[in-house]
Regions:
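Carbohydrate-active catalytic/glycan-binding domains of CAZyme proteins
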Residues: 20-374, 416-419, 490-493, 531
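Hydrophobic h-region of N-terminal signal peptides that target proteins for export
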Residues: 9-18
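Sec-dependent signal peptide recognition
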Residues: 2-7
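Alpha-helix initiation/capping motif
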Residues: 8, 210, 270-271, 442-444
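Extracellular and organelle-lumenal recognition/adhesion modules and their flexible linkers in secreted
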Residues: 353-531
């Protein structure tokens, strides 16, 4: 647990390494880590949303981040070597902020005691809050078993009390929504529930949140997209255009991010019934996350859309940290997800930049692939996400092939006390083999790989029987490498310093040869610029 304890200590007072706002207005957001409030207490928020409301005490607008606190989030943060198969609702927690990075300690605004007074606990999740000026009420919409629960408060700071539950059967044909979030139009202040069909999630809907018969309800329902099953349903607005966004139905695991867009919130959305894969999410499945919610920052210099991904690590075991926040870029009207480990945001101007400690390797902990690869079921694949495998000698990688080597390994509980998550890179075969696994890292329009010196690291363990295990990085015609020449049946670190990157391109990888039956695991690969 030493590695995880050190990481937690570094991130005690925010979403990044700084304990207080920086003088230039840029504050760091570090993904792949557990987050902490300004007093050092954990942030357990999952499946929620950020909204801009007036502080009841000062009248000043602030950011209000609501999310569900599950008991398992506490347990997993304390010991990420155990994945949980049940979720137990503790509360909806509220954190507030003025810069989207430094957040106040959690305040439970909807408690399990309040829920228990009106029914069984069961599933509660996927929630958001809307302000209804006609009633001077804040309405919290949350999935509750087979219904949509509505709780209300006269203050954005709660407490929220049970108001009623909505059976969606006469509206969409199922009593529940598939997934849902609350979206508030930044130009009109009107809020909407963005959600999917309760069975199969193959239809997406928009409903305005308003008052009906004296209480908050869902009005003006419209089906705006159908076809493939999609969950994590949410929305953002950019340059007057609405983007309906969703993830694949992979349970708790990360997935590709999909979208359609329209000039009106009720559509028509294009391409019609054909959600497109968002650029930038393909090589690590949206930074090993699902679509959670978005927030558009109207800065003084630029408008930045914040992708707030849910990593359900407590239930998927797919890494560290429950929230993965990253900025979007746009090529015209086409959104691009910038998958970053560490970056800095200026909330006032809307500007952002890559942080000096960013890890440029994508899917470096090999958690994007939720099952064994090669995989014969959805998503059918014969390679690791973000990585290329070259078979130099040995059995070829074949889906459903009886002799095909497996490319990833299911980490044991003992493994997970040292390395990240349920999966690692795996080298083994039934016959003598030689294999190379590589990833090419290249500058993009928004995320440059600056020329200069870098350090490459990884964790490795292996059985006897290997001719060589080489970790390497290549750039500008130069090769930098390190070899393992002794047996390491326990995890050990690999490190290459002084990797010189030229022309904004680098290839990192591993070259391994071994006897039949020899096994090697590699995990937590990084390429970070030297400071």
């Amino acid at each position: 647990m030493k590695r995880l304890i050190i990481a937690s200590a570094i991130l005690m007072l925010g979403l990044g390494a700084e304990a207080a706002p920086k003088a230039d207005g840029f504050n760091r957001i570090t993904n792949d880590s557990f987050w902490y409030a300004t007093d050092g207490t954990p942030i357990y928020s999952q499946g929620g949303g950020i909204f801009r409301f007036k502080d009841p005490q000062t009248g000043k607008e602030r950011y209000y981040w609501y999310g569900v606190h599950y008991k398992e989030a506490e347990k997993y943060m304390a010991n990420p070597s155990i994945t949980y198969d049940k979720c137990n609702f503790e509360s909806v927690d509220l954190h507030t902020s003025d810069d989207l990075v430094h957040w106040s300690p959690a305040v439970p605004v909807l408690t399990k005691e309040e829920v228990k007074e009106h029914g069984e606990m069961g599933w509660l999740g996927r929630m958001g809050v809307a302000y209804l000026p006609e009633a001077k009420l804040y309405a919290l919409f949350i999935q509750h078993n087979n219904a949509v629960m509505v709780a209300t408060s006269e203050s954005p700071e709660g407490p929220f009390r049970w108001n009623h539950e909505i059976d969606m059967t006469d509206r969409i044909g199922t009593p529940n929504t598939g997934d849902q979030t609350v979206f508030t139009d930044p130009d009109t202040g009107i809020s909407y529930l963005i959600y999917s069909y309760g069975r199969g999630r193959n239809k997406q809907y928009v409903s305005r949140i308003g008052i009906k018969d004296g209480r908050p309800d869902l009005l003006d329902l419209k089906e705006v997209c159908k076809g493939e099953s999609r969950e994590g349903n949410c929305m953002f607005k950019h340059n007057g255009k609405y983007y309906m966004v969703a993830s694949n139905i992979y349970g708790w695991d990360g997935s590709l991010t999909y979208y359609v867009s329209a000039d009106d919130i009720y559509g028509p959305y294009t391409p019609v019934n054909d959600m497109q894969v968002m650029r930038g999410c393909e090589d690590d499945y949206s930074h090993v996350a699902q679509t959670g919610f978005f927030y558009t920052i109207p800065g003084s210099k630029k408008s930045t859309v914040l992708y707030c991904g849910d990593r359900w690590a407590d239930f998927a075991g797919n890494g560290v940290g429950y929230n993965q926040w990253m900025p979007l870029s746009f090529a015209g009207d086409t959104p691009v997800l910038n998958s970053l480990h560490s970056w800095e945001l200026n909330e006032q101007t809307g500007e952002w930049r890559v942080a000096p400690d960013n890890n440029y390797v994508l899917n470096g902990s090999f958690e994007a692939d939720r099952r064994s690869v090669p995989l014969s079921v959805k998503p059918r694949q014969d390679k690791l996400t973000g990585w290329e495998t070259e078979i130099i000698k040995g059995n070829k990688v074949v889906i459903d092939g009886p002799d095909s080597p497996r490319l990833n390994f299911d980490n044991t509980m003992a493994d997970r006390r040292i390395v990240t998550g349920e999966k690692s890179l795996y080298f083994a075969d039934k016959v003598p083999f030689e294999r190379k696994v590589t990833q090419q890292i290249t500058s993009t329009e928004s995320v440059k790989l600056p020329d200069g010196l870098y350090t490459m690291t990884a964790m490795v363990k292996h059985t006897p029987g290997f001719g060589h295990i080489t970790m390497f990085a290549e750039s500008g015609g130069k090769r930098f490498s390190t070899d393992i020449n002794s047996n390491h049946t326990q995890w050990m670190p690999l490190r290459i310093e002084g990797v010189r990157v030229r022309n904004g391109k680098a290839t990192v990888g591993f070259h391994v040869s071994g006897d039949a039956g020899a096994e090697c695991q590699i995990d937590d690969v990084t390429l970070v610029r030297q400071q």
